[in-house]
């Protein structure tokens, strides 16, 4: 007489399949304006990105210290508590952050001399379109997939 396989076998197979599925890129949105931060989070989630939100640079550093490892950081410059400039200074000296591509979304001109010293990948000047933002994120996520070792050895 044939005995059917235990039912837990199917659930284990599903878990294994889920574990082997590609990981969604994780985007850290650092923006002090709650509406803008939540809107970006919702739009990026709808485009199949995982999102972590931080209201200022200090909050973003705390999330990384607790284990968050974003693939891309979207960073506003003008924020209270810790602005984007200070965040980038600390990013440059932190092994957990220094290789993460950073897209600055700001109204500040990108030709500011301080920008030359920072680990910024690109600037998106406000107002920008969601398509421009997605293209910038996609370019960084695609670069990470193609050359992951280059970011680890930097």
Q: What annotation goes with each model-predicted range?
A:
Residues 76:
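Active-site residues of response regulator receiver
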Residues 79:
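Receiver (REC) domain active-site loop signature in two-component systems and cognate sites
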């Amino acid at each position: 007489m044939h005995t059917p396989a235990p039912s837990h076998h199917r659930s284990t197979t599903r878990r294994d399949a889920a574990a082997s599925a590609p990981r969604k890129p994780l985007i850290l949105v650092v923006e002090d304006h709650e509406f803008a931060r939540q809107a970006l989070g919702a739009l990026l989630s709808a485009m199949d990105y995982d999102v972590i939100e931080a209201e200022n640079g200090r909050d973003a550093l705390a999330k990384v210290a607790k284990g968050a490892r974003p693939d891309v950081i979207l960073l506003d410059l003008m924020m209270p508590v810790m602005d984007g400039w200070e965040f980038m200074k600390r990013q440059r000296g932190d092994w957990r952050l220094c290789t993460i591509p950073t897209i600055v979304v700001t109204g500040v001109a990108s030709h500011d001399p301080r920008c030359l010293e920072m680990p910024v990948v690109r600037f998106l000047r406000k107002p920008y379109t969601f398509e421009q933002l997605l293209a910038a994120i996609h370019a960084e996520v695609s670069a990470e997939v193609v050359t992951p070792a280059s970011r680890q050895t930097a």
